[in-house]
Amino acid sequence: MEPESIEICPYNPHHRIPLSRFQYHLASCRKKNPKKAKKMASCKYNACHVVPIRKLAEHEATCVNRSSVEEEDTLGPLQVSLPQPQNQDTLQVRWLSNPDIWNVDGANCHPMFVLKSFVPQKLVCESDIQESRGGDQCPEDPQTRTRKANF
């Protein structure tokens, strides 16, 4: 088995921590050293890279975890353009009269119902709710020792 790499704590150089525990150690050591923590900053490419604030820009420019995607200008809003429909009438759903419907006033005046948005809601059976609460369970029949349904 290969030995795990050891990292040096930026808050206390006497602390030598295995890489697998380094993130947890940084959080606890930051709390224990609030004065030193105010002078330090985390790299935006790797939270385990904690450097002095004055050296942060230099570190981020040369950080090994920096990728080409992050080098693009991500500070501005994302520009998205949607194609404009050329003819609005072609997109609308038209109501076609049904020959089976007769003797109804204004049958051709109402457009077809189209659901434009759907907000899903959690659907739960009442029996599931009762079981999760632990109450109102089916009572037992004392003669047969079987449960009766509450219908």
From Swiss-Prot:
- Listed binding positions for Zn(2+) 1 are 9, 15, 25, 29
Residue ranges spanning the membrane: these are none
State the residue spans of region: Disordered: 130-151
Mark the CHHC U11-48K-type zinc finger spans by residue number. 6-33, 40-67
UniProt KW keywords:
Metal-binding, Repeat, Zinc, Zinc-finger
Fetch the PROSITE patterns from UniProt: ZF_CHHC_U11_48K
Q: What is the superkingdom listed in this entry's lineage? A: Eukaryota
The GO terms describing molecular function are: protein-containing complex binding; zinc ion binding
Residues holding Zn(2+) 2: 43, 49, 59, 63
Keyword Zinc among record annotations: yes
Q: Name one Pfam family in it.
A: zf-U11-48K
Family according to the record: Belongs to the UPF0224 (FAM112) family.
Query: Which named protein is this?
Result: Gametocyte-specific factor 1-like
Annotated organism of origin: Mus musculus
